[in-house]
Amino acid sequence: SHKGKVIAIENQNSWTDGGVAAPTPFYWSTNGYGMMWYTFKKGEYDFGATEKNVVKLSHNSSYLDIFYMVNDGAVALLNDFYQLTGNPVLLPKFGFYEGHLNAYNRDYWKEDEKGILFEDGKRYKESQKDNGGIKESLNGEKNNYQFSARAVIDRYKSHDMPLGWLLPNDGYGAGYGQTETLDGNIANSKSLGDYARQNGVEIGLWTQSDLHPKEGVSALLQRDIVKEVRDAGVRVLKTDVAWVGAGYSFGLNGVADVGRIMPYYGNDARPFIISLDGWAGTQRYAGIWSGDQTGGVWEYIRFHIPTYIGSGLSGQPNICSDMDGIFGGKNETVNIRDFQWKTFSPMQLNMDGWGANEKYPHALGEPATSINRMFLKLKSELMPYTYSFAKEAVDGMPLIRAMFLDYPSAYTHGTATQYQYMYGTDFLVAPVYQKTQADEKGNDIRDGIYLPAGSWIDYFSGEKYEGNCILNNFDTPIWKLPVFVKNGSIIPMTNPHNNVSEIDTVS
């Protein structure tokens, strides 16, 4: 509920609690109506903050152009919005697995006892400037394999961790090749793509500049999205503020361009675009990423839960954020809890290389390695379930659902259930988002879990609970996420696996 709040409908590039990363000039009410402003101008929606029980909406426009929707229920009103702006894209299957993002074509690695431990048993520190160390590359062809993008794929495999896709150029000035020509660099990207696909992983590219060739741009930073998709096999695109940071129509036109190119030149590949600075219509082409934040703190988990819920209510069901943040980290408990709850979300971005700490699921050692693996494997097992409800979100309920959508009441219409949600129709997920009575190992309890009327089964213990109650002191040892299944549900699952190519389609 936005009651009593003022919501900025503008591209702020503010990525903390209360900030705006991807505004949408649309809202709807459980009273059976919705409104969408037909504008790209900044706005402000006041839901009774300055005058009780009065909603005041405004945009910095000299004329009034609004669509009104009158309909019964969330699905009908969301579909009215989709009729005007386009239905949400259904992500390709590999997009529901963890993605790893970093730059592997720019930096130098020099031995340093305080650095990151590599496979050769030595520690190295990374520098964007030539420090006399070993320069990285995508394919490890320069006696630098452990610093290459290929080594990332090997690393996930050696730790038995699921990995769906890899972005090897996520960093300013990185590019994806070290030759003197754009075509030479595209061939370099294709070589990585061939290796990745042999291992069940797709590749993508991060974008800081124009996607089409431009005169006067060096080969390193030159782009040709058509050749990248057609020749190198690129199947993911992630935008950033340097390209779509202006937002509004500029950002929307950018993702729309790629949304058309990827299937046309990519053998009918389903577009997988991750963007920010969105607007009404972004959902037609892209999923939303919440921006750059600091992990290792409880606040990072806390504010993302209602963010994910609210995104779906706003017609943007494909929502994601970085695993344990792009910066910070090294808090084992927070790291584990973030991997746990995002098992029950669409996308997972492991954003490595921007901060001082590694961002692999195994980076913190045991017990984090085993617990994170357990939940990544669970996410893979749930692919039939997740994909079914992701398909439903194209013209129905979002995958991550506010409690009031399926269980409307005075209690769920407020903020009392903002830290739990339904994942599809059958899973109730109540993430651990704060320290309550934790011991030194992170074992804790979870208070305030609302179970609607009916019978609910603790997914991990099998214990049965009768609903229409609030659970307090729910035991949450470090390995356990509070997840409940509606009694009588049939959950389609598959074998635990590491990428789409390993799904058992026979048994």
What is the predicted function of each stretch?
Residues P25-F26, G32-M35, D65, K93-Y97, ...:
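Beta-sheet entry/capping signal
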Residues K157-G164, A187-G204, K227-L237, G259-P271, ...:
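Secondary-structure transition/capping motifs at alpha-helix termini
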Residues S1-N143, I153-D154, D406, N473-N499, ...:
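Catalytic and substrate-binding clefts that recognize carbohydrates or anionic sugar/phosphate headgroups
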Residues M35, K42-Y45, G73-A74, A103-Y108, ...:
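Flexible loop/turn segments at secondary-structure boundaries
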Residues V89-V255, M262, Q283-R284:
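Aromatic-lined carbohydrate-binding/catalytic grooves of carbohydrate-active enzymes
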Residues D130-S158, P162, D183-A187, Y195-G200, ...:
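Gly/Pro-rich turn-and-neighbor structural signature
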Residues T30, W37-T39, W165-D170, L205-S209, ...:
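Glycine-rich, histidine-containing beta strand-loop boundary motifs that form or position
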Residues R260, T282-I288, T307, S311-S321, ...:
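Catalytic core of carbohydrate-active enzymes
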